[in-house]
UniProtKB/Swiss-Prot annotation:
Domain of life: Viruses
Function recorded in the entry: Contributes to the regulation of viral RNA transcription by interacting with host proteins involved in transcriptional activation such as ATF4, or CREB1, and by inhibiting their activity. Additionally, HBZ suppresses host NF-kappa-B-driven transcription mediated by host RELA as well as transcription of some classical NF-kappa-B target genes, including IL8, IL2RA, IRF4, VCAM1, and VEGFA.
Subcellular location: Host nucleus
Bias (Basic and acidic residues) ranges: 69-86, 125-143
Record flagged with keyword DNA-binding: yes
Protein's UniProt name: HTLV-1 basic zipper factor
Gene: HBZ
UniProt motif (Nuclear localization signal 2) ranges: 115-119
GO biological process: viral process
Comment field on protein domains: Contains three nuclear localization signals NLS-1 and NLS-2, corresponding to two regions rich in basic amino acids, and NLS-3 corresponding to its DNA-binding domain.
Length: 208
């Protein structure tokens, strides 16, 4: 979610919500902790490898010094194998943790992308509605202006012809419109008759 802070009379700046800041802080903390754990694991593995190398070298040269014999036939190779298995399990656990963090970051990026798309869609919708409102006002203004011009023209005509003359002119225009309407109705009837004629002929051809 994005809030806006007004700066000056006509501008506003986006300000991230506290929830987004909290999520970003948590992610930064997780990444920092992950880096520290990796460094610690690498240091432990390095120390363990060094100890095992020294033990193996000492065993090959002098045998185990200052140590008891491996219990019940356990050899140093067995201990080395167990240490390697332990390191392997650690690596697998690290991979799983990295996978979970990557999935979390992926979901976070997808959510942020969805929020950006929604914000863009809302902005486009607001711009479209604003444009439609401006066009509606423009049409209304033109209609009002045109109506005012028509009323002014009728008033001037009435003044010029007088009430009786203007009334006779309106009657003449009404008769002309009625005659035009009758002509259009007759043309429509003629067209419908022709359509019906050809439709009957087609039906007769299909029925044969």
């Amino acid at each position: 979610m994005i809030n806006f802070v007004f700066v000056g009379p006509f501008r506003c700046l986006p300000v991230p919500c506290p929830e987004d800041l909290l999520v970003e802080d948590l992610v930064d903390g997780l990444l920092s902790l992950e880096d520290e754990l990796k460094d610690q694991r690498e240091e432990e593995e390095s120390v363990l490898d060094g100890v095992l190398s020294l033990e193996e070298e000492s065993r090959l040269r002098w045998g185990p010094v200052g140590e008891e014999a491996p219990p019940r036939g356990e050899t140093h190779r067995d201990r080395q194998r167990r240490a390697e298995e332990k390191r392997k399990r650690k690596r697998e656990r690290e991979k799983e943790e990295e996978k979970q963090i990557a999935e979390f970051l992926k979901r976070k990026r997808e959510k942020e992308a969805w929020r950006r798309r929604r914000a863009e869609e809302k902005a486009a919708d607001r711009a479209r509605r604003k444009l439609e409102e401006e066009e509606r006002r423009e049409r209304k203004w033109r209609q009002t202006e045109q109506g005012a011009k028509q009323r002014s023209a009728r008033k001037e005509k009435m003044t010029e012809l007088g009430v009786d003359g203007y009334a006779r002119q309106l009657e003449s225009e009404a008769e002309s419109l009625e005659a035009e309407r009758g002509r259009l109705l007759q043309e429509n009837d003629d067209l419908m008759g022709e359509v019906n004629y050809w439709q009957r002929r087609l039906e007769a051809m299909w029925s044969q």
